[in-house]
């Protein structure tokens, strides 16, 4: 983890990785053809561990896929299992998330062909009556929304220009074989609803099969960035209420004026977003203290324990490049259930 011999590396903690305050840059170097002809997870991890720090550890919030690639590698090291196997056994299966999984090309079964590290349906390939345990059936491809045409490295990528469907869009995760701590999961609204409700039930100490203790979820869903204090959440909500009161048109799609509510005060739980520049999917009515996460392809999940509510938006907004961004759409959707609940304004 310290190939650059940077003494600051010794100050990086798991808390910093989980709150995106480690000082790592956002994305891996994609230089060279690694992982294009065939997946190379080891090279992705090597690059993640050797990436120079862009900021001092603990100094600023900077969303980093690299940090979560490292966390995924740590999970595999500690458990001795591939990440997709571990998560399937400990999260997806117990919550009955039958339509949720990683789709690594190496474990595809059925009528398909592999092009580099991408999957494509092939009607002329032999049919498979029953897929072995540990694989996934390419019959799923018909149910998966396409994301975008593969734009990764013209001339070196055999899949370049082809439509990605059932292959993770994130190029780093794709080069690593479709399973990384930063990306790779496919799901449905139903399954994400099961996940969110189980999480809410566990937080509220109701019967739940969610695989974490309430005390652990408390760390994930309250501010945990370096230097956090209990007063930050109250101050952020006060600032958001004041901003909303000063907004002439509360239905404006630009929503509240500030994300985060207090400029320079980014609030992150362990993994979850609470109040940062990425929090627009929260909308203008759910309080700061609700939490969620967005995805580049047009996916968001936002959860509000105070009202026992969750909002799921799944869109393939980058299917046509240059289309409208999904973040404003998610932010417009979230206030609708908040208003309907009658708890958070009109």
Protein language model features and the residues they cover:
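Acyl-group handling in specialized metabolite and lipid biosynthesis
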Residues: 1
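Short, surface-exposed loop or secondary-structure junction motifs
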Residues: 4-288
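Structured C-terminal helix/loop/strand segments within mature extracytoplasmic catalytic/sensor domains
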Residues: 289-346
